[in-house]
Amino acid sequence: MLSPFDWRRGISSSGTGGTMAAQPLSSTAATTAAATGATAATAATAATTSATLSTAAASTSTTAAPSAGATWINHHLAVEADSSQPANGSDAQAGVEGPTMPAGYLPLYEDVETAAEDAGYALIDDISEWLLGSVGSEAAVGGPENSTNLAVTGANGTLAWLEALNSTQPAQSNSSAEDGERGRYSLRSFVEQQLAGGGAAGAGDGGDAGIALIDSGEEAALDNVADAETDYGMLGGFGDAELLQRTATVARETLGNRTAPSTTSYDGGGSGDVGVAGGLAGTAGGGVGGAGGSGGSTFMLLLENFNDYFPNYNGSTVSGTSTIAPGVAITGSRGSGLLLEQNLTGLYLDGYRLNCTNETLNLTDSCGELRVVDHNYWALILILFPILTLFGNILVILSVCRERSLQTVTNYFIVSLAIADLLVAVVVMPFAVYFLVNGAWALPDVVCDFYIAMDVICSTSSIFNLVAISIDRYIAVTQPIKYAKHKNSRRVCLTILLVWAISAAIGSPIVLGLNNTPNREPDVCAFYNADFILYSSLSSFYIPCIIMVFLYWNIFKALRSRARKQRAARKPHLSELTGGSVIENIAQTRRLAETALDSSRHASRILPDEAATNTASGSNEEEDENAISPDIDDCHVIVNDKSTEFMLATVVEETGNSVVAQITTQPQLVVADPNGNHDSGYAASNVDDVLAGVAPASASAATSAAPRSSGSPPDSPLPSGATLQRSSVSSQRRPTGDDSPKRGEPALRSVGVDNSSVAMKPLSFVRYGVQEAMTLARNDSTLSTTSKTSSRKDKKNSQASRFTIYKVHKASKKKREKSSAKKERKATKTLAIVLGVFLFCWLPFFSCNIMDAMCAKFKKDCRPGLTAYMMTTWLGYINSFVNPVIYTIFNPEFRKAFKKIMHMG
């Protein structure tokens, strides 16, 4: 971020909106010296020294034009000092040989409200101020010809420099003007000299090398930190002095790794560490441009040594063998600038972080906090999600283990999915809650790698299990014969093992060292390998999701095609029914119907079984929506008198609101003798799918049909061999006294059925006797008959006949097929909902993940922020909590199993 400008060592807050005002170096020197107990004379001497430096530098400003970096900084300095200067574009100040403002300003771009950025600026600021200040020029004190003689002391220039850094504390002035110039204030003097076009004898080479610190350093490092608050807060809670002290301590322990500088020539700003003084001041004593260039190049060496002595994130030191030594080809402005940018980038942008827990060096200084963090205690509420996720997925696993009806191929995959969700709740979510509440990652790196690896493995396993489920559903719907032939537990177990093996293969590289990259941050648990992020996101999410969407689309098309065919063949008219067809007779109602016989004009009533017991195997939830709907053709009761032709009359079904149904006559069917002498002793072979019909009394009776009466209704006839039926419910009860038929009322008998379509078993297993299921008794209401009177009347109609229930296998098979198809559709819909919720929960995270990797890989400023990552990550975790809820709502079998386990049903 290039604005607002801030002079880090000369900050003066106006108190209004945090506006920063620049202060001259002379004022700063006096103030600082006075604050540290220095005399007024000392402060005045420091101020005078600074002004002398600026004057001396300005006198040489015409020898060389400033570099592009110097011109850019110069322009902005001028704008700050003089509001009449152009506010944009450096061209307006091109070629200017000095600032138009008082000397002594160090331009740095700082967002004072961002701690991480502040720490990033502190790195460049401290390197600049203490690194250059410790070996600063004495040009103003002893003259240019002596500039290199007093720069540093000690046999080893590099170590002496580090010791000088250690002795220089922030906001402190040394006891003398010379020490102050050599120490704290030399950098500002140097910056002013370079902005004024210093480095005359060296043709600006030394000056360009110094400007590179401000130009290349800030552009390479600080501009990158502006949009990465948490990524580059590398100094955090460490004080500036502590950083330098630690650096010096590390240097003493690792002298063998440094780059040995040349110290053969101190004259004329020669090579070696002390050549920095000549290069920086631009006073190469020999008057040769190479001398100034050497000063700049050796300045690069200092930075490289600084890098060599700095411990990296895991406590080791950067090897000195990688140091780039200066040479003829890289001296001068261009070579020095490139070296500085490279070394400074290697030092800072590669992500050096202080990590006390991992350092093995003998560091005596306290580590302190990595950075100032805020604890988010509100995030503790998120602990509810792992608890609820654990509870729900345990219910899923126990339900399948305990209920044999749930032990299907699809549900085995659901168990595998529940195990993955269970691991998310136990292993992944707690670490995520900790990280969010604590505000920083303070656990060892190996724990972070384990957390990330389990996150990858579990989410990958979840989606691979959904892929396996979608393949299973696709084969079951599109190739049912093949599916029934090949499905077995062994194949399912192998598939599940393969799913987990692939998931582990994708996530395991994280714990094997793949995440140990140079830019790793100890207090942030994240994944830093952009290539692996791209690979894992594609292989574990995007490609499988494309496969699942394709499979489910084909499943839905197949189901839609099947539904169309079922609707086309749905509910034919009674006249179109063939032998063996089934029309169900409902027995579980409150009060059904009444009929009368024309021949006697005697009102008869059919008394329903009021104490009915439901013996159906399937619930209403499992009935096929394409089955015969309860409309006007659904409820049928047949009565007959032996002396008249068969009549079917109006029937009333009472289910809260009466529904009137008209049915037809069937002259071909015969009922048994009302005397009850030929009652059948057989019932349906499966009580679960009983059909409330009537049985043939005898072979002879089945063939003795009376001709149709001319007065019968003109409706289409009921086909031969049809059995009457309504729903898959049958009722049985013991008749009470009121239930017995009264004299003069014909009893309901049985209707003939095509024996080829009927299989019968003895009725002995029916609890109360199905034959007593329905009787004719009450006089609640009557209906007039719909046929003409017959001259014959059965004198024995007072005897209660019985009623026999049969099962037609053909109809039962169709019913089972419909029920099975219904279950297949419901299971597929449930799994499709699971898939949709999964995509909704995880797609945002993987989108952010792959965007971050692409931006990092191609070095674009488009990476999503920390807030987006946190929100999308937790949205993905919530998917593990939602899955059991989906089963509870949309799957009645799981719902029943859940209730049973929790003792709620």
UniProtKB/Swiss-Prot annotation:
Composition-biased stretches (Low complexity): 702-722
Record's bilayer topology term: Multi-pass membrane protein
A GO biological process held by the record: anesthesia-resistant memory
Pfam families attached to this UniProt entry: 7tm_1
Ranges annotated as biased composition (Basic and acidic residues): 735-746
Stored SUPFAM superfamilies: Family A G protein-coupled receptor-like
Sorted UniProt keywords: Cell membrane, Disulfide bond, G-protein coupled receptor, Glycoprotein, Membrane, Receptor, Transducer, Transmembrane, Transmembrane helix
Compositionally biased residues, Polar residues: 723-734
SMART domains listed in its UniProt record: 7TM_GPCR_Srsx
Functional note: Receptor for dopamine. The activity of this receptor is mediated by G proteins which inhibit adenylyl cyclase.
Protein's name in the database: Dopamine D2-like receptor
